[in-house]
Regions:
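Conserved N-terminal helical subregion
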Residues: 53-157, 163-175
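Conserved FAD-binding catalytic core of PHBH/FMO-like flavoproteins
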Residues: 55, 138-242
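Generic enzyme active-site microenvironment
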Residues: 30-31, 146, 263, 270
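C-terminal helical "tail/cap" subdomain of flavin- and related membrane-associated enzymes
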Residues: 231, 290-363
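Glycine-rich FAD cofactor-binding loop and adjacent beta-loop-alpha segment at the N-terminus
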Residues: 4-6, 10-72, 97, 101
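FAD/FMN-dependent oxidoreductases across multiple families
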Residues: 216-300
Length: 363
């Protein structure tokens, strides 16, 4: 079918686009390179209010607020010292959910539209269509959306120009039972960042995200940091962690090339310090939703507008992350007292803190 839309990648971003196309009665097909879905209950995501509202409009049965965990207060520390508290009386800061749960909920109603085990190895474009080739089959469509993550095969085949760099850190995740009071905690130290995100399942848990530059045993380092910096959270010993991948940033200079459009991590990836990667990908889908007919028809001004506006937002987030990483991730180069006093100064201005929360909740 040459008028169908091809979506490469069946992660959350790919499923968001699929739900959008399904809602508009536009034919589509999802190509997934893996032969099965891999689950990890320790992985969580923080969703903004913008993201939740948009996702709920795509599927009336999703109702994220009914099963996810709201964050009412976020506390930021430099080592052991609390320097900044972000809270909002009438509106939660963000919402935490297991990535597997979000994915399985988004997957409902799309199962028959996904073809597993289809790794793209070549592509061919014409004036009105694009054909993607796998080892065993070819798929033709009007447009292809690259939603296949940070190491996007489709992006590589399309020869996008990409800027990238490594942070010199690895990321690990864990899940530990603890009373959380709907509070998130983030610790900045010389060895990296340590976040505790509240998660309510059968019991209360903290989802732990640990980004570190240490080369010794990361589990031992994590438990040492918890003991030294986060004793007041009453968290027991973490028995196991998963992950360990190298953290890198990449940004495609344009989000479209020919009949290929990048969405989410395929176009831009971010340090998990800010927890905004998925939200920005959903923001990409929100822009596409507002201009869907033009974009899937290959309208060049519409695709240029998508690329320019989304990359502006992505550049803003990159600047914020680089500023935080430069200060806290390399705090050996700055006086600890300078960092502490800077955060405490900001903590005295409610309007400034409101602006931070407002920006964080915009995709």
């Amino acid at each position: 079918m040459s008028n169908q839309i091809l979506i490469v990648g069946s992660g959350v971003n790919g499923l968001v686009l699929a739900k959008l196309l399904q809602q508009r009665d536009i034919p589509f097909l999802i190509l997934e390179k893996n032969s099965q879905f891999f689950e990890n209950p320790e992985r969580t995501v923080a969703l903004t209010n913008d993201s939740i509202r948009f996702l709920n409009t795509l599927d009336k049965n999703l109702d994220i607020n009914a099963w996810a965990t709201p964050v009412n207060n976020m506390l930021l520390y430099q080592d052991t010292e609390l320097n900044l508290s972000l809270n909002k009386d009438e509106q939660k800061i963000s919402t935490i959910c297991q990535l597997d749960t979000l994915h399985s909920q988004m997957l409902k109603g799309l199962e028959k539209k996904i073809i597993m085990g289809q790794e793209i190895n070549a592509m061919k474009e014409s004036e009105r269509s694009i054909t993607l080739h796998t080892e065993s089959k070819s798929y033709k469509g009007a447009m292809a959306f690259g939603c296949d993550g940070i190491n996007s095969t489709l992006r590589g085949l399309s020869e996008f120009v990409v800027d990238e760099w490594y942070y010199g850190q690895k990321a690990y995740v864990a899940l530990v039972e603890a009373e959380h009071k709907n509070e998130a905690h983030q610790f900045f130290s010389q060895s990296g960042t340590l976040a505790f995100l509240p998660l309510s399942l059968d019991k209360q848990y903290y989802s732990i995200i640990f980004c570190t530059n240490v080369t010794t045993d990361p589990l031992n380092e994590l438990n040492t940091l918890i003991k030294n910096n986060a004793k007041h959270l009453n968290i027991g010993e973490v028995k196991s962690i998963s992950g360990g991948h190298d953290l890198k940033h990449h940004s495609a200079k344009s989000l479209h090339s020919g009949r290929v459009v990048l969405c989410g991590d395929a176009g831009n990836s971010f340090h998990p310090m800010a927890g905004q990667g998925l939200n920005l990908g959903i923001g990409d889908a929100m822009h596409i939703a507002d201009n869907l007919d033009k974009i899937i028809s290959g309208n060049l001004p519409a695709m240029n507008d998508y690329s320019a506006k989304r990359n502006t937002k992505n550049a803003q987030m990159t600047w914020i992350i680089q500023s935080l990483f430069g200060a806290f991730g390399n705090s050996v180069g700055l006086s600890k007292s300078v960092l502490n006093e800077g955060m405490k100064f900001l903590d005295k201005f409610p309007k400034a803190k409101e602006k931070i929360i407002e920006f964080a909740n915009k995709n």
